[in-house]
A protein has these predicted regions:
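Short solvent-exposed beta->alpha transition segments
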Residues: 18, 34-88, 93, 101
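Exposed beta-sheet edge and beta->alpha loop/turn motif
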Residues: 81-179
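Hydrophobic, Leu/Ile/Phe/Ala-enriched alpha-helical segments that form helix-helix packing faces
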Residues: 28, 57-61, 145
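Short, low-complexity N-terminal intrinsically disordered segments enriched in polar/charged residues
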Residues: 6-26, 30
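C-terminal segment of classical bacterial N-terminal signal peptides
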Residues: 1-5
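Short charge-dense sequence patches
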Residues: 6-11, 42-43, 121-122
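Generic detector of well-ordered alpha-helical segments enriched in charged/polar residues
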Residues: 22, 54-58, 168, 172, ...
């Protein structure tokens, strides 16, 4: 249920956000983190570095784990306040992440990886299938979409607790409180 405070998004904004989210999630599935960064709202980088943004995924990839994103799906979108001609919206999406542990070395990482993923996705959303050597994580995450007149299109912030400090420094408090 949307709060009475939620702004409805115009059909034009809705379509624009859908198209951008679709591109964003496809790039995530391809693990093209460099291009994903182009979809980020630039002021966030005054408060966090680009390399920190996907650190966990890159760390896993460097250790030899072939991440597989799948079943990405937008669950809902909610318009937030418009402040100084900048529009904001909150997008909830779902995805799954498979981490095949194809070598003995990678299987040895499982006791370390599972707790890290559980702290990121919630204990109930991470399964380790030893017989298939596969860790699966299901997640529901949030993006904040921002349409700032300084930029030509909707851009995103990864809206989660790991980014809290940077978000608080980037987004007006009344928008943040509403989200």
């Amino acid at each position: 249920t949307l709060s009475a405070n939620a702004q409805s998004l115009s059909s034009k904004d809705n379509a624009a956000i859908d198209a951008k989210v679709d591109q964003f999630l496809k790039l995530m599935e391809k693990k093209d983190y460099t291009k994903v960064l182009d979809f980020m709202y630039p002021p966030i980088f005054e408060h966090t570095s680009k390399k920190d943004m996907f650190q966990i995924f890159e760390m896993l990839e460097q250790s030899g784990i072939e991440l597989k994103f799948k079943n990405t799906e937008v669950l809902n979108k909610q318009g937030l306040k418009t402040i100084k001609d900048t529009k904001y919206a909150l997008i909830k999406y779902r995805f799954e992440l498979d981490l095949p542990l194809n070598t003995d070395e990678l299987r040895g990482y499982a006791p370390l990886l599972v707790p890290v993923l559980q702290s990121n996705f919630g204990k109930e959303n991470v399964t380790y299938n030893k017989s298939q050597n596969l860790i699966n994580a299901k997640g529901e995450k949030f993006l904040m979409a921002i349409n700032d007149p300084k930029y030509s299109d909707w851009l995103f912030l990864i809206y989660d607790s790991s980014m809290r400090t940077a978000i608080e420094k980037t987004i007006p408090a009344e928008v943040n409180n509403q989200a």
